[in-house]
Amino acid sequence: MPRNPNSFRLTARNIFLTYPRCDVPKEEVLEMLLHLSWSVVKPNYVRVAREEHSDGSPHLHCLIQLSGKSNIKDAGFFDLTHPRRSARFHPNIQAAKDTNAVKNYITKEGDYCESGQYKVSGGSKSNKDDVYHNAVNAGSAGEALDIIKAGDPKTFIVNYHNLLANVERLFQKPPEPWVPPFELSSFTSVPEELQDWADDYFNECSAAARPTSIIIEGGSRTGKTMWARSLGPHNYLSGHLDFNSRVFSNDVKYNVIDDVAPHYLKLKHWKELIGAQRDWQSNCKYGKPVQIKGGIPSIVLCNPGEGSSYKDFLDKAENSALREWTEKNAKFIFLEGPLYQSTAQDC
């Protein structure tokens, strides 16, 4: 016999509704559910999904997460009236014990709309699998951390630093390509040997398995930095070496090493960078080791004088072996004047 309407009672914080043969647009149903006569507790999150059955009739599935536990005694509380005709729709009503499972089930066809911030349920292994599945597919690092904080608070507290590092690495965006302020064609006084090096390397037909780097020594405001950075996609290492993925990419054509003291580079990665070595690992202080793809040349830029000049550094007796190696792996260019004729390019 039919259930007595007076015996209905729903005490749940998460609710799963199914409206069979309901042709009301899902967006309108979402608004209707948000504006039901809620009393003390209010919806924090609502998702409405449309599913078309094999006979062509539409069903609507809904997940509602409330601010607290409901105490609904009206069996018709969730009944909806079609906004453009007199049809009325009564749903199947259940407490959603596993909101992750319900959320995934109702949106398997991908046709849904939602409002509010979904709160991931935690506890069981399967639920935690969903927590991390949702975190990986979040829109940002902050959103992923919020999902893990709600669904697996113990890991969030105990392993926060490792978790933060992993999430930031997962959502790390590659560095933005540098846009040169001057056209490459504006450098009209490039020495022939320097231009030949660039033409040879950037001609893909003549690309060498292990290309030669180049060391350019010249005074300030000769345009050497702007010229070097205008050749194509590159990493720019200025003053020190930084292989953090926020500024360093393995998907560029060359490195520009600008004003990095030769004694510093010797202590770090002289042969790896100038020798265009492949598949090596950084060991710079204060950072975790980073795997470098390599195989690209470096343009080393320096000023003349003690502490800056790579030639003067290599001419020292204690660096004779390094000088011999460098001369086999790099060309030296000494600028006698600016690489441009205009007074605008003074870098």
From Swiss-Prot:
Motif mapping: RCR-1: 16-19
Pfam families, alphabetized: Gemini_AL1, Gemini_AL1_M
GO cellular component: host cell nucleus
Location in the cell: Host nucleus
Free-text domain note: There are 3 rolling circle replication (RCR) motifs. RCR-2 is probably involved in metal coordination. RCR-3 is required for phosphodiester bond cleavage for initiation of RCR.
Name this polypeptide is given: Replication-associated protein
Annotated region (Binding to RBR1), positions in chain: 141-151
Source organism, top-level taxon: Viruses
Keyword Metal-binding: yes
Chain location of the short sequence motif RCR-2 per the record: 59-61
Cofactor(s) the protein requires to work: Mg(2+); Mn(2+)
PROSITE patterns in the cross-refs: CRESS_DNA_REP
Family membership: Belongs to the geminiviridae Rep protein family.
Gene Ontology molecular function, alphabetical: ATP binding; DNA binding; endodeoxyribonuclease activity, producing 5'-phosphomonoesters; helicase activity; metal ion binding; nucleotidyltransferase activity; structural molecule activity
Biological processes annotated in GO: DNA replication
E.C. number(s) listed in UniProt: 2.7.7.-, 3.1.21.-
Functional description taken from the UniProt entry: Essential for the replication of viral ssDNA. The closed circular ssDNA genome is first converted to a superhelical dsDNA. Rep binds a specific region at the genome origin of replication. It introduces an endonucleolytic nick within the conserved sequence 5'-TAATATTAC-3' in the intergenic region of the genome present in all geminiviruses, thereby initiating the rolling circle replication (RCR). Following cleavage, binds covalently to the 5'-phosphate of DNA as a tyrosyl ester. The cleavage gives rise to a free 3'-OH that serves as a primer for the cellular DNA polymerase.
Record region (Oligomerization): 154-174
